[in-house]
A protein has these predicted regions:
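Mg2+-dependent prenyl diphosphate-binding active-site environment of isoprenoid biosynthetic enzymes
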Residues: 12-113
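Double-stranded RNA-binding/processing signature
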Residues: 4-7
Length: 113
């Protein structure tokens, strides 16, 4: 397998992991879950979770399932930093990765959340 194929496969695995860990868009928190899912699923290279897993392996880890919550959390924290960077009080960006920023689609209050 070449590098690009490996990278694509890992991104797909991380996207599946995030879909499993993120909340369902239903119930009383539906709008919050929609904003969270929109933000996290806006794209990206998913390098941070990949690097975390590789460091774990480098240090002798062999049970990848143990790392899944940490990988998902790391990607969510990174996404949070991007959402906050886009807010009007910071860069006031309207688009990220070709899509409306979270605060433009859901309102500034959801961008802060």
């Amino acid at each position: 397998m070449n590098f690009n194929e490996e990278l694509k496969q890992r991104v797909e695995q991380i996207n599946a992991l995030l879909a499993e860990k993120l909340p369902a868009e239903e119930g009383m928190q539906q709008r919050v879950a929609e904003a969270m899912n929109y933000s996290v699923n806006a794209g990206g290279k998913r390098l941070r979770p990949m690097l975390l897993l590789e460091v774990y392996r480098l240090l002798g880890g062999n049970d990848e399932k143990i790392m899944e919550p940490f990988m998902a959390a790391l990607e969510c924290i990174h996404t949070y930093s991007l959402v906050h960077d886009d807010l009007p009080a910071m860069d006031n960006d309207d688009y990220r990765r070709g899509k409306l920023t979270t605060h433009k689609k859901f309102g500034e209050d959801f961008g802060v959340l």
